[in-house]
């Protein structure tokens, strides 16, 4: 579930008081895009006691790493996700790397890496997991 918090001028402490998520997604800490790193740092500073998964974004920088958490996905979900990405980030469409093929290919590679029975997977980086 993605929450719309409305006011984007909340301080980290105000945000933390308003939300108590079970799972938090943020950018990969080693993402070479400076804005993405700032968001990742902000996320870890705000929700350091929560389960945080860092996602990857394929782009020119070649900063994809070796993720350690995988979620097997079926083909219909992967295609739907790629379509939603294309619709949601219209400002990125002019970039050569921003294509459905890129997202489908990455999901296929991650599926191979985790031996997904469904052929595809989404991968994340998990720095800290409490069981």
Regions found by a protein language model. Name each.
Residues 18-19, 45-51, 55, 70-131:
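C-terminal accessory domains and tails appended to enzymatic cores
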Residues 1-51, 65, 87, 102, ...:
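Active-site beta-strand->loop->alpha-helix modules in alpha/beta enzyme cores, enriched
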Residues 62-69:
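Flexible "cap/lid" loop of the alpha/beta hydrolase fold
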Residues 28-29, 56-58:
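Histidine-centered beta-alpha loop that forms part of the nucleotide-sugar donor binding/catalytic region
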């Amino acid at each position: 579930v993605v929450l719309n918090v409305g006011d984007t001028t909340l301080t980290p402490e105000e945000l933390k008081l308003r939300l108590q998520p079970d799972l938090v997604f943020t950018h990969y800490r080693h993402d070479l895009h400076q804005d993405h790193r700032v968001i990742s740092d902000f996320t870890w500073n705000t929700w350091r006691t929560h389960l945080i998964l860092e996602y990857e974004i394929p782009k020119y920088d070649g900063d994809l790493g070796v993720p350690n958490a995988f979620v097997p996905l079926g083909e219909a979900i992967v295609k739907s996700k790629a379509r939603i990405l294309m619709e949601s980030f219209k400002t990125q469409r002019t970039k050569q790397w921003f294509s459905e093929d890129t997202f489908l290919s990455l999901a296929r590679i991650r599926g191979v890496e985790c031996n997904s029975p469904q052929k595809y997977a989404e991968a994340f980086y998990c720095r800290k997991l409490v069981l």
